[in-house]
């Protein structure tokens, strides 16, 4: 019996796959528990349409991420921080500080996506890498100046 898995099933397959299982396993376990649906022509057509829609959505998200990466690469951020002698900061600049500075410029980016090369503890120019999407990153210049 061919079924389309609705959810991941251990030792059978992942959601969205069409798998061949024994009739009893399909009718008595997978279908009643909502783990699979029977692989009829209409269900297969629906699955293909769903996959195409997901692919279109992924493409759209990728395009948006590339667009945002271009905009971000042109933006620089200046952070004014209290510093002592020789440009040594009191504390350090974190991804949260960069997130807030980007928010002021109109970019909503989660701090978890911002990767700093190291903890910034001195004044100077650094580059933060922002991971926007799978394989799409943007580099933002971060200038740290004494207050």
UniProtKB/Swiss-Prot annotation:
Cysteines paired by S-S bonds: none
Q: Which PROSITE patterns match?
A: RIBOSOMAL_L9
**What molecular function does GO assign, one term?**
rRNA binding
Example GO BP: translation
Annotated keywords: Ribonucleoprotein, Ribosomal protein, RNA-binding, rRNA-binding
* GO CC terms in record: ribonucleoprotein complex; ribosome
By its UniProt entry, which Gene3D superfamilies does this protein fall under? Ribosomal protein L9, C-terminal domain, Ribosomal protein L9, N-terminal domain
Q: In the record, which residues are listed under signal peptide?
A: none
Which Pfam families is this protein grouped with? Ribosomal_L9_C, Ribosomal_L9_N
| This protein's record includes keyword Iron-sulfur | no
Similarity field = Belongs to the bacterial ribosomal protein bL9 family.
Q: What does this protein do?
A: Binds to the 23S rRNA.
What is this protein's name? Large ribosomal subunit protein bL9
**Organism source for this protein?**
Caldanaerobacter subterraneus subsp. tengcongensis (strain DSM 15242 / JCM 11007 / NBRC 100824 / MB4)
């Amino acid at each position: 019996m061919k079924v389309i898995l609705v959810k991941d099933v251990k030792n059978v397959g992942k959601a969205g796959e069409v798998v061949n299982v024994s009739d009893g396993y399909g009718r008595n376990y997978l279908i009643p528990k909502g783990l699979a649906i029977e692989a009829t022509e209409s269900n297969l057509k629906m699955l293909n349409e769903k996959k195409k829609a997901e692919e279109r959505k992924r493409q759209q998200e990728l395009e948006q991420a590339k667009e945002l990466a271009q905009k971000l690469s042109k933006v620089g951020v200046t952070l004014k921080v209290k510093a002592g002698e020789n440009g040594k900061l009191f504390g350090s600049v974190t991804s949260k500080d960069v997130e807030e500075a980007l928010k002021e410029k109109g970019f909503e980016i989660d701090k978890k996506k911002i990767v700093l090369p190291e903890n910034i503890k001195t004044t100077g120019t650094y580059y933060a890498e922002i991971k926007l999407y799978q394989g799409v990153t943007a580099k933002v210049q971060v200038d740290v100046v004494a207050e």
